[in-house]
Amino acid sequence: MSLATTDLCDAFDAEIQVLDPVFQSFGGHARFHGPIATLKLFEDNSLVRQMLGEPGNGRVLVVDGGGSRRCALLGDQLGELAVKNGWAGLVIDGCVRDSAALGKLPLGVKALAAHPRKSVKRDSGQRDLPLRVAGCDILPGQWLYADEDGVIVSGRPLG
């Protein structure tokens, strides 16, 4: 079966959540999927760096950045770290920077917008907890599928 979000919605509509269509694609891979890891933070990407420094094992990092459009939570250096450590992608309720460089990486990246300002570094935030992002409840260990048509979440691997 295809892992296109449209096909997954058709086949598994009762089992999935569709995130509100608020994200733009910034990574070199428009299509990505994997089990979810979560972070909740605000204008501080210290935990993003910490998490991406760990083995990704094909996971997708979902970052609840509070929807801030005042600074970026991911740039080219953290994108390269994600690739090096085997992350499939990121979905960020916030901004990214170095968007041209991110677009060349073999990584899925969805975010609200690009912003040139870097975040603060105060080691604040939480990891591995339930989130509410783009109208959906998201839990660590659920599965995320993203492509040109949107982002969906399921309690189990689909397809």
From Swiss-Prot:
Q: Locate the residues binding substrate.
A: G75, D76, Q77, L78, R97
What catalytic reaction does the record list?
4-hydroxy-4-methyl-2-oxoglutarate = 2 pyruvate; oxaloacetate + H(+) = pyruvate + CO2
Q: Which cofactor does it need?
A: a divalent metal cation
Q: Provide the cofactor note recorded for this chain's UniProt entry.
A: Divalent metal cation.
**UniProt keyword terms in alphabetical order:** Lyase, Metal-binding
Could you tell me the superkingdom of the organism this chain comes from? Answer: Bacteria
GO terms of molecular function: 4-hydroxy-4-methyl-2-oxoglutarate aldolase activity; metal ion binding; oxaloacetate decarboxylase activity; ribonuclease inhibitor activity
Biological processes, Gene Ontology terms: regulation of RNA metabolic process
Its quaternary organisation is: Homotrimer.
Q: Which family does it belong to?
A: Belongs to the class II aldolase/RraA-like family.
Q: What is this protein called?
A: Putative 4-hydroxy-4-methyl-2-oxoglutarate aldolase
What lineage does UniProt assign to this protein's organism?
Bacteria, Pseudomonadati, Pseudomonadota, Betaproteobacteria, Neisseriales
